[in-house]
């Protein structure tokens, strides 16, 4: 059997290569071999959330896997059948003794595209870190990523059972995916239109109520100075450990954009607010439609469209170009990423009129 070889050290060289390759392998029935996984990282190889993603996608398509263990830099993934809808429970903590704050949102973004094209509805419970560094938080996925996918025909609902913060995790979310799609609808977002509203949530877990209130107040003040009114709700959550963060959503005529800042010991509530607001204002001034994170997260779904997707992005990042490279390696769609004169990017994803072609045995 010939396996498609994917160099895990290419470009950004992180976990996104693993996740995108797994999703596309399951969707197309392509057997893959990932090598040099996270080779340039301080702790190379598969981490807990990567291993959970491997096992989760393998469960969806009855894949045979080799090298699925913590720290492994080589992985073989051979799908056994088309993706099957069902009820699944995935625990990032199972991959490491004592639990993990591994990012469950990244695992969710790995399993959702295959389930969206499965024959029936699915329910997925995911346990681990819901608001952790280096990953989109629950609020971003629910308020920005999923609504953007809804424009592309994906019907899914996400709810928070309990929040999980770094370093303990132990949060839980529930995802319901309708399934039944043969392909997705192309995303057209070259121009974003007028800013309609900015909303947000200032959250703190196991911390005094004044912390989210201070984050919300400072964020409203910073945005007001820039001429933007914002409706930001402070809230205190229960969790297994303390945590705090501010999550902002900018709603334009034709798109959404999201911005996050997390707290940590020694970082003031006001600084958290200023960080999130700074990201929002930088995006707003760029004139682009998609924020830099949404752009790389939408490449894979756009590759599942029959028609061409086109969108502008605030900034071209290594995550974006690396994800485009992985999609190109599968031959499912061609991705063009170009730098515009103003420093923003323009992404064109040429759809596949034949749709997703399965090569399962």
UniProtKB/Swiss-Prot annotation:
<keyword id="KW-0963">Cytoplasm</keyword>
<keyword id="KW-0436">Ligase</keyword>
<feature type="binding site">
    <location>
        <begin position="293"/>
        <end position="297"/>
    </location>
    <ligand>
        <name>ATP</name>
    </ligand>
</feature>
<dbReference type="InterPro" id="IPR037136">
    <property type="entry name" value="RNA3'_phos_cyclase_dom_sf"/>
</dbReference>
<dbReference type="GO" id="GO:0005524">
    <property type="term" value="F:ATP binding"/>
</dbReference>
<comment type="function">
    <text>Catalyzes the conversion of 3'-phosphate to a 2',3'-cyclic phosphodiester at the end of RNA. The mechanism of action of the enzyme occurs in 3 steps: (A) adenylation of the enzyme by ATP; (B) transfer of adenylate to an RNA-N3'P to produce RNA-N3'PP5'A; (C) and attack of the adjacent 2'-hydroxyl on the 3'-phosphorus in the diester linkage to produce the cyclic end product. The biological role of this enzyme is unknown but it is likely to function in some aspects of cellular RNA processing.</text>
</comment>
<protein>
    <recommendedName>
        <fullName>RNA 3'-terminal phosphate cyclase</fullName>
        <ecNumber>6.5.1.4</ecNumber>
    </recommendedName>
</protein>
<dbReference type="InterPro" id="IPR036553">
    <property type="entry name" value="RPTC_insert"/>
</dbReference>
<dbReference type="Pfam" id="PF05189">
    <property type="entry name" value="RTC_insert"/>
</dbReference>
<dbReference type="GO" id="GO:0005737">
    <property type="term" value="C:cytoplasm"/>
</dbReference>
<feature type="active site" description="Tele-AMP-histidine intermediate">
    <location>
        <position position="319"/>
    </location>
</feature>
<dbReference type="GO" id="GO:0003963">
    <property type="term" value="F:RNA-3'-phosphate cyclase activity"/>
</dbReference>
<feature type="binding site">
    <location>
        <position position="109"/>
    </location>
    <ligand>
        <name>ATP</name>
    </ligand>
</feature>
<dbReference type="GO" id="GO:0006396">
    <property type="term" value="P:RNA processing"/>
</dbReference>
<dbReference type="InterPro" id="IPR013791">
    <property type="entry name" value="RNA3'-term_phos_cycl_insert"/>
</dbReference>
<dbReference type="InterPro" id="IPR000228">
    <property type="entry name" value="RNA3'_term_phos_cyc"/>
</dbReference>
<dbReference type="Pfam" id="PF01137">
    <property type="entry name" value="RTC"/>
</dbReference>
<dbReference type="InterPro" id="IPR023797">
    <property type="entry name" value="RNA3'_phos_cyclase_dom"/>
</dbReference>
<comment type="similarity">
    <text>Belongs to the RNA 3'-terminal cyclase family. Type 1 subfamily.</text>
</comment>
<dbReference type="InterPro" id="IPR013792">
    <property type="entry name" value="RNA3'P_cycl/enolpyr_Trfase_a/b"/>
</dbReference>
<keyword id="KW-0067">ATP-binding</keyword>
<dbReference type="InterPro" id="IPR017770">
    <property type="entry name" value="RNA3'_term_phos_cyc_type_1"/>
</dbReference>
<keyword id="KW-0547">Nucleotide-binding</keyword>
């Amino acid at each position: 059997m010939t396996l498609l070889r994917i160099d895990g050290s290419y470009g950004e060289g992180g976990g996104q290569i693993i996740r995108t390759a797994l999703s596309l392998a399951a969707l197309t029935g392509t057997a893959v071999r990932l090598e040099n996984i996270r080779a340039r990282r301080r702790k190379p190889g598969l981490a807990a959330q990567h291993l959970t993603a491997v096992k989760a996608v393998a469960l969806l398509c009855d894949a045979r896997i080799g090298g699925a263990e913590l720290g492994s830099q080589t992985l073989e993934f051979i799908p056994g059948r088309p993706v099957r809808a069902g009820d699944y429970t995935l625990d990032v903590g199972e991959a490491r003794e004592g639990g993990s704050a591994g990012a469950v949102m990244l695992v969710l973004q790995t399993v959702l595209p295959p389930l969206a094209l499965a024959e029936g509805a699915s329910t997925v419970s995911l346990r681990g870190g819901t608001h952790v560094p280096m990953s989109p938080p629950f609020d971003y996925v629910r308020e920005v990523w999923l609504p953007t996918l809804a424009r592309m025909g994906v019907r899914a609902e996400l709810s928070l059972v309990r929040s999980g913060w770094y370093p303990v995790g132990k949060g839980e979310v529930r995802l319901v995916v309708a399934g039944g799609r043969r392909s997705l609808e192309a995303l057209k977002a070259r121009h974003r239109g007028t800013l309609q509203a900015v909303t947000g949530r200032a959250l703190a877990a196991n911390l005094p109520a004044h912390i989210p209130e201070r984050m919300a107040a400072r964020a409203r003040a910073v945005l007001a100075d820039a001429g933007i009114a914002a409706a930001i709700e402070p809230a205190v959550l229960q969790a297994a450990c303390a945590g705090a963060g501010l999550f902002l959503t900018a709603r334009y005529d034709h798109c959404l954009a999201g911005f996050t800042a997390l707290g940590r010991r020694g970082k003031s509530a006001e600084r958290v607010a200023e960080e999130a607001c700074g990201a929002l204002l930088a995006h707003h001034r760029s004139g682009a439609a998609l924020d830099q994170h949404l752009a790389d997260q939408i490449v894979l779904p756009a590759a599942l469209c029959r028609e061409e997707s086109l969108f502008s992005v605030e900034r071209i990042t290594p995550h974006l170009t690396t994800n485009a490279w992985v999609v190109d390696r599968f031959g499912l769609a061609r991705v063009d990423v170009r730098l515009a004169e103003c420093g923003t990017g323009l992404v064109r994803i040429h759809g596949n009129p034949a749709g997703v072609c399965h090569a399962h045995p």
